[in-house]
A protein has these predicted regions:
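Helix-start (N-cap) detector for alpha-helical repeat units in TPR-like alpha-solenoids
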Residues: 252, 286-287, 303, 320-321, ...
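Extracytoplasmic and endomembrane cell-envelope/extracellular-matrix remodeling and assembly machinery
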Residues: 7, 12-14, 18, 40, ...
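Residue-level detector of the short coil/turn that links helix A to helix B
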Residues: 266, 300, 334-337, 371, ...
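Terminal, low-structured helical/coil segments at or just beyond the last alpha-helical repeat
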Residues: 369, 378-380, 386-434
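Residue-level recognition of tetratricopeptide repeat
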Residues: 260, 294, 328-331, 365, ...
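Catalytic Zn2+-binding segment of zinc metalloproteases
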Residues: 82-99, 117
Length: 434
């Protein structure tokens, strides 16, 4: 669960999520949404796709990020997804994943996409409601909703003083792919029907908006470059990365890419000096320190990993994923004092990352080691609820109630979890998202 890691299908990375948030926050504000209430998640999939699910969560495929030529293209796509959120557009899919964990949502989307494309009904398809499997409409917005989200996106981009040209370029790329293949194989096109009227509408807006020639900011251009370099280094074979960024390239991004590639081999004799050089030059960058902590932790050097992780958290105090990584390091150090610190950091992190099962799992471990068995059971109940496992959630909630003082905050939360878990479909008991 460190840095760029998670289930096979999705990537959690503090830096990339923060950078995308930086780019899209002006759009969220223009839409009248509270930025802290929104999440952006990366799906590890080379196909072009993005979608909204489970409330105010915007999902974006790594394939779309890597294909974006400009920040404006990425912002345009996310402005469109924000249009769906602001418009309260619900597909039947939205209803099905209302309370699902991030893994659960992605498993359903991939299952639905495979079924819609006729790629067998194995795996994820079993998680869909019966009529959803049969009907493509499960994931699909209506043409009216699509037009409405486009209209909203134009409004938000104008209000933020940004160009809609990126969205038009993105539509043109998709249209080209559709014409080439002659089918609707692209998952984005299946869930977001693209009509010539939609393209015309955006083109017309670009012709008339006074913001159409507003260039991308140098800061955003730099952010997208760094996102793509980091994503590429984490998802391509290390040999590919090292060939793309030979030692003679001493730019910051090339060294960052090489540090990641060496760590993934794993060759710490080369990875550590490379990342140490970047830390020396950029002492206030939390993510270089995070990578160093990750390298050390994953190679069994737990005690050495604590300091870089602590420094990363000090430099990015608002990043819950960094707190979860640091807490994991504290727990693995097998020091009771550190374990107490882990409990404090995790309680802080799960307030915003309540859909991230790993935080709850680590919290249960830390409470267990601290002999707070009632609180450990409560954390396991939260994990069960988040993962959509009705039986686990209810069993652990009852266990917590038996161990915690009656009417304490924990006792009352256990009661609520037991009640909330009733809403989970029984079918999902057999679904293991991890």
């Amino acid at each position: 669960g460190q840095a760029v890691a998670a289930a096979e299908t999705y990537i959690r990375d503090s830096e990339i999520e923060a950078d995308i948030r930086t780019m899209v926050t002006p759009i969220w504000k223009a839409a009248g949404l509270e930025p802290n209430a929104l999440h952006v998640y990366l799906v590890e999939d080379n196909q072009i796709n993005s979608f909204v699910a489970g409330g105010q969560n915007e999902f974006i495929n790594t394939g779309l990020v890597m294909r974006a030529k400009t920040p404006n293209q990425l912002i345009g796509v996310l402005a469109h997804e924000t249009g769906h959120i602001a418009g309260g557009h619900l597909t039947r899919f939205q209803d099905a994943v209302r309370n699902a964990s991030i893994e659960g949502i992605i498993a359903m989307v991939l299952g639905a996409a495979a079924t819609v494309a006729g790629k067998g009904s194995g795996g994820g398809a079993a998680m869909l409601p019966a009529e959803g499997v049969a009907q493509r409409a499960f994931l699909q917005y209506s043409v009216t909703q699509e037009a409405s989200a486009d209209h909203a996106a134009m409004t938000f981009l104008d209000a933020a003083g940004q160009s809609a040209r990126g969205l038009l370029e993105f539509f043109q790329v998709l249209q080209g792919e559709e014409l080439l293949s002659g089918t609707r194989e692209d998952p984005y096109l299946r869930s977001h029907p693209l009509t010539s009227q939609r393209i015309e509408y955006v083109r017309n807006h670009v012709e008339h908006s006074r913001f159409s020639d507003v260039p991308d900011t140098p800061a955003n251009i730099e952010l997208l470059k760094r996102i793509k370099v980091k994503l590429g280094a984490f998802t391509s074979p290390p040999s590919t990365t090292l060939a793309a960024y030979p030692e003679k390239d001493q730019s910051v991004l090339a060294r960052y890419a090489r540090a990641i590639a060496y760590y993934r081999i794993p060759n710490l004799n080369k990875a550590l000096p490379t990342i140490d050089g970047l830390i020396r030059e950029y002492p206030n960058d939390p993510y270089f320190r995070e990578l160093k902590g990750q390298m050390l932790f994953e190679n069994g050097r737990v005690a050495d990993a604590i300091q870089p992780y602590e420094e990363a958290v000090r430099l990015a105090p608002g990043a819950p994923l960094l707190r979860i990584s640091l807490a994991q390091t504290y727990i693995e150090s097998n020091d009771p004092k550190m374990n107490k610190r882990a409990i404090a950091f995790l309680n802080d992190a799960v307030r915003t990352e309540y859909k991230e099962t790993q935080g709850w799992h680590l919290l249960a471990t830390a409470y267990g080691r601290d002999n707070q068995i009632g609180m450990a059971a409560l954390a396991l109940a939260e994990e069960g609820l988040t993962a959509g496992k009705k039986k686990d959630a209810q069993q652990q909630a009852l266990r917590a109630k038996g161990l915690l003082p009656k009417n304490s905050a924990g006792y009352n939360r256990a009661e609520n979890i037991h009640r909330e878990a009733e809403q989970i479909e029984d079918a999902s008991n057999s679904t293991n998202y991890r």
